[in-house]
Each structure stands twice: as C-alpha cells, then as structure tokens.
Curated annotation (Swiss-Prot):
The keyword Membrane applies. Binds 2 heme b groups non-covalently. This is Cytochrome b. Belongs to the cytochrome b family. The lineage of its organism: Eukaryota, Metazoa, Chordata, Craniata, Vertebrata. The cytochrome bc1 complex contains 11 subunits: 3 respiratory subunits (MT-CYB, CYC1 and UQCRFS1), 2 core proteins (UQCRC1 and UQCRC2) and 6 low-molecular weight proteins (UQCRH/QCR6, UQCRB/QCR7, UQCRQ/QCR8, UQCR10/QCR9, UQCR11/QCR10 and a cleavage product of UQCRFS1). This cytochrome bc1 complex then forms a dimer. It holds the Pfam family Cytochrom_B_C. Heme b b562 binds at residues 84, 183. One of its GO terms (cellular component) is respiratory chain complex III. Heme b b566 binds at residues 98, 197. Its cofactor is heme b. The chain crosses the membrane at residues 34-54, 78-99, 114-134, 179-199, 227-247, 289-309, 321-341, 348-368. Component of the ubiquinol-cytochrome c reductase complex (complex III or cytochrome b-c1 complex) that is part of the mitochondrial respiratory chain. The b-c1 complex mediates electron transfer from ubiquinol to cytochrome c. Contributes to the generation of a proton gradient across the mitochondrial membrane that is then used for ATP synthesis.
C-alpha cells in the first residue's frame, strides 16, 4: 500500500498531528473554542494590519490624514480599518474568556502552557497599546504620554527609560515611528509564541470540563472539533462584521476624531475599554510608584495561579464555594472596568479602591482558603 503523504511527508505530518489526527477529549465544551477563535483573530489582524500599513504614514504631520485618506479614498479602506479596530476588541473578548475558562477549569496546572499564555496576553496588551497611538488622534497622543510616563516612577533609571522610549523629551515624531515599527513586529512575535503555546499544550493534551485524565476516551480533532471550531468562527465573524459595518465607532473614543494637539489636554484621559480594569487599579493608589506596581501585579498575578491551587479537585465544576468566588471576581472586574471609564471624583474613587483591594484579596487569599475548606468538606 502506498504511504499516505499526510502521515509521511515531514511538513504535512506536523500539520496532521496538530490539526487532523490530534487525539482530543470527547467531552470538551464550547469554552474550548476560544483558542481557535484567537488564532482567527490574529490572522485577521495581521491581514488587515498589513493592508492598512500599505497606506499609513508614520509621521506626526501625516499620520492622522493618512488614516482619513485610507477610509475615504482606498477601495474598502473604511471596512479594512473598521475590521482592524474592532478586531482588537474581539481579540480581547476572546482572550479574557479563554483565560477565564482556564482559571475555572484548572487549566493553569499545565504550567508551561499557562505561563506562555500569560506572556501572550502581555505581548497582546503591548501590541494593542502601541497600535492605539498610530492614528495620532487626541486620545492616542495623551494615552501614549500618560502610560509611557508611568515608567518614570521606576527609581533612579525611570526618567532615562522614558526619554529613551520617547526618543526625545516628549511624545513626538520619533515616538510615533518606533511605535509603528513595534506594532508591525509584535504580532509576528505573538504568532511565534502561539506555536510555543501549542507545542506545550500538545505535550500534555487538553484539559476537559471534569478535570480528569481522558486518555482512555479520545476522539480525532477532525472532523469533530474542526467542524465545531468552524461554527465558532462563523459566530465570531457575525458580530465582528456587524459591528464593523453598522457601528464601527461604538467602542472608540470621540476624542480621537480630533488630531493630536500637545497644547490641549482632553478632560478625561482613558485607554480602550479592554485596559480599563487595569487602569482603575492604577488610579486607585494615590502614589505613582505604588500605582504602577499594582498595575503590573494585576496581570502578573496570573503567574501565581498554579502555586495558589490548593484544591484536591482540578476544576471548579464540583466546588460551589469556589464557583461563587469566581463569579464574584468576574463581577469585580466588570466594576473595575466601569470605574476606569469614570472621572476621578467621589464616589468613583472609593469604589475603585474597594474593587481593587477585593480583586487581589479574592485571587491571593480567598481562593486558597476556600479550596482548603472544600477539601475539609470532602471528608464529611
């Protein structure tokens, strides 16, 4: 019998083992769809971004006009730009749901996969931040100024780092040029990290909603999960295209319709919605260095998840107290997101401080205590 090239060809064999004949648990739910949706988001962003880069000019005098030109004069330029801008929002929706699923079902116990995933999140956040600066609108400029200026809180070397990052003494042409270069480079870094992420995942195999070893009950990825993923892709593209076509500016900031002006500060500087929870944590601490450390901790705390797992059970499927805590954490993050979009005044200040404190207390103290309590309850 002639050898099947799908199983014998060096390149096709790798693809086959990763996407076709991959043994997958038979009971993984729709929450396991988000990995492939993130891959789709990345491909969409790279493709639309490449097309936008062909028409963009990374110069402070021309950046804003070049974006307007893309939307007005380039064939379907408006659609490409809207897909790219809203694609970022959907990217973050997918990654937050993906992390939430990993947290709920104890997927973080695959330590290497989890740690590369957190690195992917950090790289994605960096990419989105530098990308937001490129249209050179008011919020782009002031967002860049405020966020990069935070590095000056680092003792001794902070100010030097900021001036080095800016390429001068303020956010100006050199800053825009290097941000464009970084925004072009980072997605390919994300793609590389994704391959590492998948390599680690396929080393151990997927987790499942029950959190038990599923080696005795596997099914091939294709056709079962390839079809399930195709449905997920359709369900993701539907709201994305709807938003890009009907309300492309829904999640944007109106300030960005005004070209950047260093002499006029917007009344309320805030980042895109997907950074608001971290921004609220940053603002809730009145000290600059303390705020920066809390901001970093809000994301880096994810690295501690495997160390803080004290339960005898992997998932939260049969742990009602941990479930209650998990959904409290979700509500807490929504409150932080809302607070981040509000001005710094009473009662938002105190709500933000309470929500920030609660965020860290739930993650670092209450989850391990609750897990230990549930372990005790198993004995009764």
């Amino acid at each position: 019998m002639a050898p099947n090239p799908r199983k014998s060809h060096p390149l096709l064999k790798m693809i086959n083992n990763s996407l076709i004949d991959l043994p997958a648990p038979s009971n993984i739910s729709a929450w396991w769809n988000f990995g492939s949706l993130l891959a789709l988001c990345l491909m969409t962003q790279i493709l639309t971004g490449l097309l936008l880069a062909m028409h963009y000019t990374a110069d402070t005098t021309l950046a804003f006009s070049s974006v307007a030109h893309t939307c007005r004069d380039v064939q379907y330029g408006w659609l490409i730009r809207n897909m790219h801008a809203n694609g970022a929002s959907f990217f973050f929706i997918c990654i937050y749901l993906h992390i939430g699923r990993g947290f709920y079902y104890g997927s973080y116990l695959h330590k290497e996969t989890w740690n590369t995933g957190v690195l992917l999140l950090l790289t994605l956040m960096a990419t989105a931040f530098v990308g937001y600066v490129l249209p050179w609108g008011q919020m782009s400029f002031w967002g860049a100024t405020v966020i990069t200026n935070m590095f000056s809180a680092i003792p001794y070397i902070g100010q030097t780092i900021v001036e080095w990052a800016w390429g001068g003494f303020s956010v100006d042409n050199p800053t825009l040029t290097r941000f464009f270069a970084l925004h072009f480079l980072l997605p390919f870094m994300i793609a590389g990290l994704t391959l590492i992420h998948l390599t680690f995942l396929h080393e151990s195999g997927s987790n499942n909603p029950l959190g038990i070893v599923s080696n005795c009950d596997k099914i091939p990825f294709h056709p079962y999960y390839s079809l399930k993923d195709a449905l997920g892709l359709a369900l993701l593209l539907l709201p994305l295209t709807t938003m890009a076509l009907f309300s492309p500016n829904l999640l944007g900031d109106p300030e960005n319709f005004t070209p950047a002006n260093p002499l006029v500060t917007p009344p309320h500087i805030k980042p895109e919605w997907y950074f608001l929870f971290a921004y609220a944590i940053l603002r809730s601490i009145p000290n600059k260095l303390g705020g920066v450390l809390a901001l970093a901790a809000s994301v880096l705390v994810l690295f501690l998840s495997p160390l803080l797992h004290k339960s005898k059970q992997r998932t939260m499927a049969f742990r009602p107290l941990s479930q209650l805590l998990f959904w409290t954490l979700v509500a807490n993050l929504l409150i932080l997101t809302w607070i981040g979009s509000q001005p710094v005044e009473h009662p938002f200040i105190i709500i933000g401080q309470l929500a920030s404190t609660t965020y860290f207390i739930i993650l670092l103290i209450l989850f391990p205590i609750t897990s230990a309590l549930e372990n005790k309850m198993l004995n009764f």
